[in-house]
Amino acid sequence: MSRGFDGPEIDDFHGPERDVNRSPESNRRAGWDTVRRLERIRGEEERADQRDREARGPAGGNRPPLPREERVQLVLARTSRTNYVDRNRTYQLRDSELHALTEVGKFRVVAVHDLAQFAYNGDSSRMQNDIANLSRQGLVKQTSIMDSDLSPVRTLTLTKEGHRALSYSRFLRPDQVTYHGLKKPKEAFHDVELYRLYHKVSDEIEGRGGKVVRVKLDYEIKRDLYADLARIWQDKSKCPETVKEAVARRHGLKVVNKEIQIPDMRLEYANDPDMEIHTRDVELATEHYRPRGLAAKARAGFQIYARRGEADRLRRIRDQRELNTVIFSL
């Protein structure tokens, strides 16, 4: 659910209409094509769900460690702290604390239990020690937000000071945008889930030999897109719809139902051996999505995910509306 996305106010759309002028045989053939397509989609979802169940097992048990887990282990092995000078302040930080700052900064807000899982390989004790040190130095702030079931979730955000310190640390690529504080508290849990979704997708990319080099949230995508649109729309001689199509293509996006579709998150990654940069646009759909909105995201080419408890409902909608898209479980 991209921030600012309003579900359509018109009636839910209907699936592809049958051509009444076609022969019964053609309609039967089209019906079988739809059935086979949905069977392929369901098969892919079942295989993905099975991989998820296997991946949730502990490393060192029935599966080898993931590349991310191996990198984290190397970071955790370095326990000494280094002095970092920022103007008139000196911070004492070890690599795992810098890594935690980057994780929180890239996603604005991160659940504490998710940070332990993905940035500390489940070592909650080490994470709590790091958070205490970061908090004492005024670099992070702990906040409690409500999840979709209205249960409290402990989260972390960067403070302005933490954001500035991270910017000066040179621990990130210069083009990687970072954030501090809660911009829209009502949407905070959605951002929390994007952090987990990011690691799910990036683990899959790395499992196929790729390397994620940058992540862009919809905040950044919208900022760049709208700035480009505003600049070009100053030329009144150009057709607005033509401009919209051209700008969307320039940003690797599509216009569907006369609107530029914006994903929740874009991962940029490189594949060996060419190291050419590829992108993957992902959308975290919720139970509030109407079929028309879900269809627009699918037609835009986004990889669609949903919480485990909501994926089944969205898949039923997909089947009823004959949408040609896989819905993965988060």
Model region roles, listed by residue range:
Residues 121-142:
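Short amphipathic alpha-helical interaction segments
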Residues 1-105, 113-118, 137-330:
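Electrostatic, structured charged patches in enzyme active sites and in nucleic-acid/phosphate-binding
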Residues 108:
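Flexible coil/turn residues that form the inter-helical turn or adjacent wing/linker of helix-turn-helix
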